[in-house]
């Protein structure tokens, strides 16, 4: 079944889509330039419109770097700048998308119940305040009695993931940004097909843009034909639209509501180092077992019910009553706490960024960070430098071999001020680092899908699993230190730049919020 997916015009679809968008851009530009040549009035109106958009942006409550980039662009392009911002500058999803998700989340509110918060508050009021903020923003509570296993590489997670899928008796939920047929995806979908044939309910969500060059356009039909319900999130069409910005970057696997997985991994062979793309691919995944899995299921079901044509989900049928009872009584609070949360572009609350900033503010001893990209706001940069200046051991690890050279150049442009403030920066020499992880003080960690870049922090649907006072946290710290032994520490001498290089970095900083 999976073999049929390979080589079926996926590259052709991406090429045709790109060409059609370019044709539209050229057509719009040609029409406007020709009209402007014959209309001084239109020229003046467009310039006035650009001024109005600039004033609107100045007063808008939005990320300062994002606003400044657009203001500079509109200053350089006084005729078309305002029009470009009107077409492409709004970070919010389409009204239809916003309404679909907001309505579904509103219906779901109150589904999740947990008795863990008072116990966390008793153990550590500062961690509890962060947990409270997350619950108030995402509607997902903190849970206890949830076992967490940490896999420090994709190939280590493969067999536990397959074993969990094989154990399914009621349902499997699977959501990924990228799915690319190969050994990894083939093995997963062979199990899914077998389970669907056995009567297990199987549902799959994939992001269409993430899979534009890897899956055929009839993938949904192929899955439905073998009993797997499938949702193509935000289909990518060759029409100029703001909606293309908002992607589903989450990674979720849930089995029977009892076991769940999340982390940085997608369903592609490079993630398990079956193939080599940019040297060794360093990623991670966590396995949850217990009441905390319900939040992963909730995020999946919210997305499904918001966008699937048939509203066919009753949340109660996906719950495990035994785990719900455990969530309320919390038999063993000493085993730590887990809180999965989702971040969305539907509001003006950059939840993921705020959580990262608060982790840096909470830390007293150390904060170790994995990130594939470093294209951050001034506020997050300040949180890192302030933590380092008050004596916290802040260490940041990025790839040694990049997947996107321009973004890697942007990443390195942030090194110098961080190093000057005392942040230690390492580049993973063997290859590409794709994990998105914070760990602090042996009592707090975050493992999920949220990169340190503008798209991840402001535009995408994301998730992360917060771990409070959990026994797995030292394992995450140990993984960072072991990986650090394979990395090269960056010094101030490494960040020296020529005048041309500094000018180029300045230009890249201007476009950073768009990347």
Show the residue positions of the predicted features:
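Thr-Gly-centered strand-to-loop micro-motif
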Residues: 370-371, 398, 428, 447-448
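Histidine/acidic-residue-rich catalytic or RNA/ligand-binding cores of hydrolases
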Residues: 379-381, 408-410, 440
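Internal, well-ordered alpha-helical scaffold/interface segments
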Residues: 361, 382-385, 395, 412-416
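Helical hairpin unit composed of two closely spaced alpha helices linked by a short loop
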Residues: 373-395, 399, 404
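Catalytic-core elements of nucleic-acid end-processing and repair enzymes
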Residues: 436
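N-terminal localization/anchoring segments of enzymes in phospholipid and broader phosphate metabolism
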Residues: 1-354, 358, 362, 402, ...
């Amino acid at each position: 079944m999976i073999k049929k997916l390979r080589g079926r015009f996926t590259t052709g679809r991406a090429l045709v889509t790109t060409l059609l968008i370019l044709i539209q851009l050229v057509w719009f530009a040609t029409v406007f330039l020709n009209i402007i040549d014959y209309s001084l009035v239109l020229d003046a109106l467009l310039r006035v419109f650009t001024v109005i958009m600039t004033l609107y942006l100045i007063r808008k409550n939005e990320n300062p770097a994002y606003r400044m980039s657009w203001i500079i662009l509109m200053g350089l392009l006084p005729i078309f700048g305002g029009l470009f911002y009107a077409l492409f500058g709004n970070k919010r999803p389409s009204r239809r998308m916003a309404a679909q998700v907001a309505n579904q989340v509103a219906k779901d509110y109150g589904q999740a119940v947990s008795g863990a918060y008072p116990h966390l508050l008793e153990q550590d009021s500062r961690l509890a305040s962060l947990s409270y903020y997350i619950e108030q923003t995402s509607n997902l509570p903190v849970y206890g009695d949830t076992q967490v296993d940490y896999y420090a590489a994709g190939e280590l997670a493969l067999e536990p993931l397959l074993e969990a899928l094989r154990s399914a008796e009621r349902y499997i939920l699977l959501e990924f940004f990228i799915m690319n047929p190969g050994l990894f995806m083939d093995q997963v979908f062979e199990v899914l097909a077998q389970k669907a044939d056995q009567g297990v309910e199987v549902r799959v969500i994939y992001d269409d843009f993430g899979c534009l060059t890897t899956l055929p356009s009839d993938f949904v039909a192929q899955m439905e034909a073998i009993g797997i319900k499938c949702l193509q999130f935000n289909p990518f069409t060759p029409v100029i639209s703001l909606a293309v910005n908002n992607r589903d970057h989450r990674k979720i696997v849930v089995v029977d509501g009892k076991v769940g997985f999340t982390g940085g991994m997608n369903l592609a062979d490079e993630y398990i180092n079956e193939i080599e793309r940019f040297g060794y691919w360093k990623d991670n995944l966590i396995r949850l077992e217990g009441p905390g899995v319900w939040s992963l299921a909730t995020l999946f079901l919210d997305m499904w019910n918001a966008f699937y044509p048939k509203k066919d989900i009753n949340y109660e049928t996906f719950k495990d009553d035994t785990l719900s009872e455990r969530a309320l009584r919390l038999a063993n609070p000493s085993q730590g706490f887990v809180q999965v949360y989702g971040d969305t572009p539907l509001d003006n609350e950059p939840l993921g960024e705020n959580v990262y900033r608060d982790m840096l503010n909470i830390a007293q001893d150390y904060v170790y960070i994995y990130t594939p990209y470093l294209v951050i706001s001034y506020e997050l940069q300040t949180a890192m430098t302030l933590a380092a200046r008050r004596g916290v051991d802040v260490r940041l690890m990025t790839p040694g071999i990049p997947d996107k050279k321009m973004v890697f150049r942007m990443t390195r442009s942030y090194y110098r001020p961080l190093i000057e403030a005392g942040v230690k920066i390492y580049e993973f020499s063997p290859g590409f680092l794709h994990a998105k992880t914070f760990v602090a003080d042996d009592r707090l960690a975050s493992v999920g899908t949220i990169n340190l870049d503008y798209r991840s922090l402001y535009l995408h649907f994301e998730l992360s699993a917060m771990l409070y006072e959990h026994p797995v946290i030292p394992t995450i710290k140990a993984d960072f230190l072991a990986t650090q032994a394979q990395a090269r520490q960056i010094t101030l001498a490494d960040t020296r730049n020529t005048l041309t290089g500094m000018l180029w970095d300045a230009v890249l900083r201007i476009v950073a919020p768009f990347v």
